[in-house]
UniProtKB/Swiss-Prot annotation:
Source superkingdom: Eukaryota
Keywords: Cell membrane, Cell projection, Glycoprotein, Membrane, Phosphoprotein, SH3 domain, Stress response, Transmembrane, Transmembrane helix
Recorded name of the encoding gene: SHO1
Protein name per the record: High osmolarity signaling protein SHO1
Note: Present with 2330 molecules/cell in log phase SD medium.
Amino acid sequence: MSISSKIRPTPRKPSRMATDHSFKMKKFYADPFAISSISLAIVSWVIAIGGSISSASTNESFPRFTWWGIVYQFLIICSLMLFYCFDLVDHYRIFITTSIAVAFVYNTNSATNLVYADGPKKAAASAGVILLSIINLIWILYYGGDNASPTNRWIDSFSIKGIRPSPLENSLHRARRRGNRNTTPYQNNVYNDAIRDSGYATQFDGYPQQQPSHTNYVSSTALAGFENTQPNTSEAVNLHLNTLQQRINSASNAKETNDNSNNQTNTNIGNTFDTDFSNGNTETTMGDTLGLYSDIGDDNFIYKAKALYPYDADDDDAYEISFEQNEILQVSDIEGRWWKARRANGETGIIPSNYVQLIDGPEEMHR
């Protein structure tokens, strides 16, 4: 049975952000930017509609298309108030931005026709549409930007509800949490540095980040084989493995002089650990490596780990050891997905790292 079929994923209760979308005027009052900008828009709209009605009633030539622009602006103002009262601004940001952009074109076109027309009443109408154009431009800057943008953060800082959550930062944090579950600590550091350098992983309180329970704990959701199919061919690794190979050979020779039967058993074990930079001795097996580690004293098993789940060793793999849930194991190496460990009865072997958790002190043994 493969190790991947034994993985016991930690049950997670799906979290759901509850949002009240009922109609409440206090949601509109809680945003100073909405109150101030919409209030100025209403005043400007009243000036524009008043000047237009006065100009049209005195038999002065008035551009007919301006009427539709004024009505369209009124619909935009009413829609914005409803979106704030139902707390749906973030859900309709694209619609709001495009609609305001159309209103900006209508108002600037009307301002061009009214400014150069004769008559004092048309001047009042032109002043109203110019003010509406300025307000529309501010709205486009605000609603067209992400909530993580500097301008939006500064504007939302005056709101009672605080800074709005950013969909962009939300997606980045979800990707970061997925990376924390599926990558090694070194890969996580590289990914976190890239996100931090991009400028988006700043202060974000809307979605909590997943923090590891222990700095030395390595979790893996997809256990691969123990063999190294694509070894690193760097000089440092080459030197390290050659040194390890020599230690294994010397230990094997010592065991051969002491116990010929044990040496015969070890040389018959399969799964030869041979890489591109070995010294050519392919008779050394991982069984000898585990035999070498079984002679290590207690001082070298400097870590203690608590079993999160029970684990049954694979019968086809002579290197694995079984353990029970909540059992305390001594660990000598915490690098990689498989750790070298020893049970209380002296049995030594390898264990999957995502089945155990490192413990710091005696108080954690009883949790």
